């Protein structure tokens, strides 16, 4: 993993990518506790507690993308040709696999209720082959509860499409314009909250116009720019950086946890997911604080052990494949661990380790067995 301006590998970024990947798996391991009502209230508590801890995962990925790829040193056509197929083709392939699983449970004679365990956010499960084929046909356009995590790949392709244009502006190195953009982006992060406090349509939004004043500065592009800016190491003392990072993360977490917990009392995923996840939105001030805290501390980690460097490099190579397939294994692993009676936090931790180990091993095996085709299977 290298930057465009420096061929030296950034091992702290490899470590950060590993942390973000484990956070994604942990977040999805607690889906089963958050998506549906729990008989044990402690399961609900741990679902919210752990889920809130993991919200910076996707923003961290976006920040690393900006750090590593901006500014782009190739033509837009070359960038698109090299980057987009390695996301789009595996996304289509694995989405099809996910959509076939419910049908396969029916073929195997399993009860439909098992689908809800495997895919907690699919509230209308079906074992019909026709529904599976319909979902596969819609892959280029949308996703559903069977492929919850694939939303990120649609978003990532959008960032890739934007980056050549974004890069041309970033290369000008105009600090005033950069700071202004970030300020407007920060304003856009408050919109979900303002829509609940003031009115659902703000700054020109209405039935015939969904593009309000701050629309053009909103979304994950701000994380790209933030990662690019933070690529330059700051000379603040390490102790102060750690203190600042911890403070940012904890303050953001308090808002994220208390906000979600208060919403969970009033709403459910099936009734109003947009309200329930109001404080869990990735593009929100509180999650930015959490991501920024982790990023600043990770940036100061110096990894000198050749063995650890090699391990992190191998882990990074398999990270995209791990992301693609991890959701398949979470449900079965939790089903196997639940009868053991482990405390919920321990069950989640064990699930994360097992799922990551399985996915990493399978991805590494695909790279070894199919070296030429692997890039189109696991990225």
Task: Please report, for each region that a protein language model flagged, where it lies by residue.
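Alpha-helical transmembrane segments and their immediate juxtamembrane cytosolic regions
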Residues: 1-379
């Amino acid at each position: 993993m290298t930057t465009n301006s420096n061929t030296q590998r950034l091992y702290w970024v490899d470590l950060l990518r590993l942390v973000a990947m484990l956070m994604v798996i942990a977040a999805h391991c607690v889906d089963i506790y958050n998506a549906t009502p729990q008989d044990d209230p402690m399961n609900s508590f741990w679902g919210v507690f752990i889920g809130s801890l993991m919200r910076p995962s996707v923003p961290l990925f976006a920040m690393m993308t900006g750090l590593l790829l901006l500014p782009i040193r190739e033509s837009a056509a070359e960038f698109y040709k090299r980057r987009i197929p390695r996301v789009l083709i595996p996304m289509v392939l694995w989405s099809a696999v996910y959509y076939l699983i419910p049908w396969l449970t029916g073929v195997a004679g399993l009860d439909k209720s098992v689908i809800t365990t495997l895919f907690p956010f699919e509230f209308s499960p079906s074992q019909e082959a026709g529904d599976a084929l319909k979902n596969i046909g819609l892959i280029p356009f949308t996703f559903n509860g069977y492929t919850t995590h694939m939303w990120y790949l649609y978003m990532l392709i959008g960032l890739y499409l934007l980056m050549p244009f974004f890069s041309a502006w970033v290369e000008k190195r105009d600090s005033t314009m950069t700071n202004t953009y970030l300020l407007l982006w920060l304003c856009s992060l408050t919109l979900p909250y303002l829509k609940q406090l003031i009115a659902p349509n703000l700054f020109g939004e209405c039935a015939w116009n969904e593009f309000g004043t701050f629309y053009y500065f909103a979304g994950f592009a701000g994380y790209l720019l933030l990662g690019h800016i933070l690529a330059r190491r700051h000379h603040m003392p390490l102790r102060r950086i750690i203190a600042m990072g911890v403070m940012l993360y904890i303050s953001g977490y308090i808002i994220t946890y208390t906000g979600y917990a208060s919403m969970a009392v009033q709403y459910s995923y099936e009734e109003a997911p947009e309200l329930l996840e109001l404080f869990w939105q990735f593009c929100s001030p509180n999650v930015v604080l959490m991501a920024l805290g982790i990023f600043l501390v990770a940036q100061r980690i110096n990894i000198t052990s050749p063995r650890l460097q090699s391990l992190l490099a191998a882990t990074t190579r398999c990270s995209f494949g791990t992301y693609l397939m991890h959701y398949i294994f979470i449900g079965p692993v939790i089903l196997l661990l639940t009868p053991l009676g482990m405390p919920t936090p321990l069950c989640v931790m064990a699930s994360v380790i097992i799922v990551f180990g399985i996915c990493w091993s399978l991805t590494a095996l695909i790279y070894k067995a199919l070296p030429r085709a692997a890039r189109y299977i696991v990225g």
